[in-house]
Amino acid sequence: PVNISISNMGSGVAAIDFTGSKTASTFQVIRVFLDSSQTEELGTFSSQPILLQNLTTDEPYFLKIKATNEYGNSDFTEVLGVVTSANTPKVLIVNGFDRVSGTDNSFDYIRQHGVAIHNAGYIFDSANNESIINQRVKLNDYSIVDWILGEEGSATSTFTVEEQKLVQNFLKNDG
């Protein structure tokens, strides 16, 4: 799965949206807990977007997805997160830390960012930077954007001109 985002859909419901899995027959969703290697399988789904229901309201959920077909499994996606609530999220956390070589990228920094934002009294949605670039998620739907870049290097695209323009537009529109 690519272009991944997780959005609050109301009390106890979250939507996981993505593209790039046309040959997948099912999608396994795993919850990852903060400060623990413990995980919980939330289910296996056959359609998208995936709607997770009966989640605990006002509790951060950190999730990763794996696609499956008759030939095997994809790798798990990066970890993204959401807090479900009756209120509309004002904060979007964007994971732009894609680097895989020459770094210790655990692909789950959203857990630390999400908990800090939630402890400050905010609920949040999240997305990877590709879903922003490809206009699947709009920065201007939020008041606050936390864009995680990590230890990107010059051999990789750090914060592309396209990403910078999207953030500039967000700031010009009172973000």
Model segments located where?
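Extracellular low-complexity, O-glycosylation-prone stalks/linkers
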Residues: 22-41
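Short S/T/G- and acidic-enriched coil/turn segments that sit immediately N-terminal to beta-strands
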Residues: 45-51
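Tryptophan-centered short beta-strand motifs
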Residues: 37-45, 73-76
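Short beta-strand segments enriched in small/hydrophobic residues
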Residues: 89-102
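Beta-strand-rich modules
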Residues: 52-71
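Short, glycine/serine-rich, charged loops/turns that create anion-binding
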Residues: 22, 96-99, 152
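Pro/Thr/Ser/Gly-rich low-complexity, intrinsically disordered linker/stalk tracts
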Residues: 1-24, 57, 71-88
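Helical hinge/lid and interdomain linker segments adjacent to catalytic or ligand-binding clefts
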Residues: 101-175
